[in-house]
Amino acid sequence: MILLGVNIDHVATLRQARGTRYPSPVEAALVAESSGADLITLHLREDRRHIQDADVKAMRPVLKTRMNLEMAMTPEMLAHALQVAPEDVCLVPEKREEVTTEGGLDVRGHYADVKHYTGKLTEAGIRVSIFIDPDREQIQKAFDAGARVIELHTGAYADAPHASEREAELARIREAAEFGASLGMVVNAGHGLNYHNVKPIAAIPQIAELNIGHAIVAHALFVGFPQAVREMKALMESARAR
């Protein structure tokens, strides 16, 4: 069984584009859950470009599955996470000038911070994952820092312009997933996954969960949000069933 985390950031992006009260990320989360999502992922960025504090607070008590809150390692975000108390927090790198998260967190370069934030969140009963590139050293450092969950960054795979490069990136992800699992870690993956490239990733047996947002929200424009979620879940499950 493989789980689908629906990222609802870009529902909020559409709302923020006009400064309206709609579409509601909370409503989108509930629709995603009723359509087969196993958890809801959202990124409260420091610049608040899409998800807002009020979205997180309103969503927390009404979700029937799990909340996976993505956040940068800052005192402000730690305070928010401790107050909201989601089931999961995923520590991610963040740059104000980026369009979307550009790569995995450099655990080796920020080891002390990763260990500190992982410890504080774990003490509060929140499961911590680290968004990292599919690299053995980064995975080992995440484990050493106390994380027992990782999310492998699949962006290089998704953006590979040629089949040979895509296969090479897929091999890296497979190896990373195997290594993480050998340490006893829960291995998730995400970033840039869509209806055309998700199946090879979903077929990796060590991967427990995929977090996907932009592709689902975009496809929903044509087929509706419930159907977009159902189609993605079906693709993932068919890949795993082989």
UniProtKB/Swiss-Prot annotation:
Marked site positions, Transition state stabilizer: 151
Active site: 43, 70, 191
InterPro entries: Aldolase_TIM, PyrdxlP_synth_PdxJ, Pyridoxine-5'_phos_synth
UniProt pathway: Cofactor biosynthesis; pyridoxine 5'-phosphate biosynthesis; pyridoxine 5'-phosphate from D-erythrose 4-phosphate: step 5/5
Keyword vocabulary terms for this entry: Cytoplasm, Pyridoxine biosynthesis, Transferase
GO BP terms, alphabetized: pyridoxine biosynthetic process
GO CC term (a single one): cytosol
Residues that, per the record, bind 1-deoxy-D-xylulose 5-phosphate: 9-10, 45, 50, 100
Main EC class the enzyme belongs to: transferase
UniProt subcellular location: Cytoplasm
Binding site for 3-amino-2-oxopropyl phosphate: 7, 18, 192, 213-214
Reactions this protein catalyses: 3-amino-2-oxopropyl phosphate + 1-deoxy-D-xylulose 5-phosphate = pyridoxine 5'-phosphate + phosphate + 2 H2O + H(+)
Superkingdom: Bacteria
Predominant location category: cytoplasm
UniProt keyword Cytoplasm, yes or no: yes
Annotated EC: 2.6.99.2
GO molecular function terms attached to this record: pyridoxine 5'-phosphate synthase activity
Pfam families tied to this protein: PdxJ
Function: Catalyzes the complicated ring closure reaction between the two acyclic compounds 1-deoxy-D-xylulose-5-phosphate (DXP) and 3-amino-2-oxopropyl phosphate (1-amino-acetone-3-phosphate or AAP) to form pyridoxine 5'-phosphate (PNP) and inorganic phosphate.
Quaternary organization: Homooctamer; tetramer of dimers.
Family in the record: Belongs to the PNP synthase family.
Protein name (database record): Pyridoxine 5'-phosphate synthase
Organism: Chromobacterium violaceum (strain ATCC 12472 / DSM 30191 / JCM 1249 / CCUG 213 / NBRC 12614 / NCIMB 9131 / NCTC 9757 / MK)
